[in-house]
Design a protein with these regions (language model features):
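Bacterial N-terminal signal peptides that target proteins for export
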Residues: 1-9
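Residue-level hotspots at or immediately adjacent to binding/recognition sites across diverse folds
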Residues: 22-378
Length: 378
């Protein structure tokens, strides 16, 4: 599913930029299904006062009445969508499997492809084959004129180059695969990032017209999965994922620092609460930490939950909501100083959620769930 480290160096060097060019007549749209609100849904966000959710089969749905009724959007894919994010009430992005990035300019009602990950990968495979072919030809020419003392090394290099070319040919002969994207976030109308499996990081500086493979800016030699990205909209950006890995930028993504890990398990989500300038990170076994200095130091947030936390939200003026396995929901009304635990009765796994007007709007297995919360909780 992922290119070899040596191939990644070549790809990073070329800094491949691509613009999706899929034509409308070749697109397969997500089917309109009456039970789509009950399908597996992985993320929820706000587009102004509108709620937008995304999940399996390319399903994106929106609601204008706090989750009571839902309409399906027109979405040109049937791939699993893992994350959805809106910069404002109109413009938003969704990402998912096969390295796909979608964009909407009408509050989530209609979507179009910005980045076709499979097309990107196929083009990359073509370029890798061309590079391998040139390297092989160059070594053959050098070997013909080589002095005896360096022939042995050149012969070994030639054998390696032949194997690289065979690998490149094999990649083109087989169906194209690429890593899924797991999260997306935009600092402003121009600059955005999407992160994913095997250390994938793609960036844009023009609102998504072009996306650039940019893994090389992070010190992630083991290609650990990157599961979550968030920021404050003022230049600070935070990325976290597998094995407790964390990265931070203080200059809008121009440079990145690896933060000292303090936990060996995986982080699945991070949310930023602008109200009190607090960053929260969470993951396996209910581990939850907060930082008041955007990742320089962390403090454990003790709670009654031991289920893995998968996602959540911290929108201005609403409770912080974190959701996870076995129907567990943590919510806070004091800016994250403390959290209350509630359990959804069916105990199915939850992927994310948000709070609004005395309600918890949750997504996960079994689709969308709206639950009332006692008045004193708000």
């Amino acid at each position: 599913m992922r290119l070899s480290p040596a191939s990644l160096i070549v790809v990073a060097t070329t800094c491949l930029m691509c613009l999706a060019t899929s034509q409308a007549d070749s697109l397969r749209y997500a089917p309109v299904m009456p039970l789509a609100p009950k399908s597996l849904l992985l993320d929820i966000t706000e587009a102004g006062t509108r709620l937008v959710v995304a999940g399996e089969r390319g399903h994106i749905l929106y609601s204008d009445d706090d989750g009571q009724r839902w309409q399906q959007a027109m979405v040109p894919t049937t791939q699993m969508l893992t994350s959805v994010y809106f910069l404002n009430s109109q413009r938003g992005w969704a990402v998912g499997h096969d390295g796909l990035i979608l964009v909407s300019d009408d509050s989530g009602e209609n979507w179009r492809i910005q980045r076709d990950g499979l097309a990107v990968q196929y083009q990359t495979n073509l370029e890798l084959r061309e590079v391998a072919h040139r390297q092989l030809k160059n070594l053959q020419q050098r070997l013909e004129a080589a002095d005896p003392e360096i022939r042995s090394q050149l012969e070994q290099d030639l054998e390696d180059a032949q194997m690289n070319l065979e690998d490149a040919e094999f990649a083109l002969a087989e169906p194209t695969f690429t890593a899924p994207l797991m999260d997306v976030w935009f600092q402003d109308a121009s600059r955005g990032w999407a992160v994913g499996a095997f250390g994938t990081l793609v960036t844009t500086v023009d609102g998504g017209q072009y996306w650039v493979n940019n893994e090389k800016v992070l010190a992630n030699p083991d290609e650990l999965h990157l599961n979550t990205i968030t920021g404050d909209g003022k230049g600070r950006v935070f990325v976290a994922g597998e094995g407790g890995v964390m990265f931070r930028s203080l200059d809008g993504g121009r440079s990145w620092k690896t933060l000292e890990p303090f936990y060996e398990g995986s982080w699945f989500g991070a949310v930023y609460n602008a109200g009190n300038d607090t960053l929260f990170i969470f993951g396996l076994r209910g581990n939850l930490y907060r930082s008041n200095d955007f990742g320089t130091s962390w403090k454990a947030v003790f709670n009654d939950n031991t289920s893995t936390l998968a996602g959540g939200s911290a929108s201005t003026g609403n409770p912080i909501v974190l959701a996870g396995g076995a129907g567990a929901v943590l919510f806070s009304t004091d800016g994250g100083q403390s959290f209350q635990l509630t359990l959804v009765e069916d105990r199915l796994g939850l992927s994310s959620g948000l709070g609004r007007d005395g309600k918890l709007i949750l997504v996960g297995q079994g689709g969308i769930k709206v639950r009332e919360v006692a008045d004193h909780a708000y």
